[in-house]
A protein has these predicted regions:
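N-terminal alpha/beta PP-like core and its mobile active-site loop of ThDP/TPP-dependent enzymes
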Residues: 1-164
Length: 164
């Protein structure tokens, strides 16, 4: 039986000592929320808007001096959170933004809430101007390595947000 990426993510966050994940429920992150609900070490802070979640994650990182974690829904979730993430970037606040996505076989077919006028599944590109790095995980076996790189980059040099 294979281990789902959502379960791998929660195990990774627990091993890193993450205690809170901020975000909003959505159909593209429901598997992560299900995995988080089984964790005794991580509390999901459910907000009523993605911008609130981003600002809460920003404030949490400022208070704890550690990278915070923001869990976002695709498309409107990402655009709604952009102001809070950009604010963290301007103030050098470490944050790992994890965005849900639709299955790859839906790319370019305009599934529910896809913000994509060019049919290339690149909606994460809206974050590129203000985050340190953007990753799209196309190969599940690369996920653990990408998460490690994401946290390391968010907290090193001039700290700032990254998007996975």
């Amino acid at each position: 039986m294979k281990d789902l990426i959502s379960n791998q993510l929660v195990k990774y966050l627990e091993a890193r000592g993450v205690k809170h994940v901020f975000g909003l429920c959505g159909h593209t992150n429901i598997a992560v929320l299900a995995a988080l609900s089984k964790s005794r070490k991580i509390k999901f802070v459910n907000t009523r808007h993605e911008q609130i979640a981003a600002h809460a994650a920003d404030g949490y990182a400022r208070a704890t001096k550690k990278a915070s974690v923001l869990l976002s829904h695709l498309s409107p979730g990402l655009t709604n959170a952009a102001t809070g993430v950009a604010n963290a970037a301007l103030d050098s606040i470490p944050m790992v933004v994890i965005a849900g996505d639709v299955p790859t076989h839906y790319y370019g077919k305009h599934p529910h809430q896809e913000v994509n006028l060019h049919a290339d599944a690149s909606q994460y590109e809206i974050y590129r101007p203000f985050v340190k790095r953007v990753w799209r995980v196309d190969s599940p076996h690369l996920f653990p390595e990408i998460m490690e790189k994401a946290f390391t980059l968010a907290e090193s040099g001039r700290p700032g947000p990254v998007l996975v």
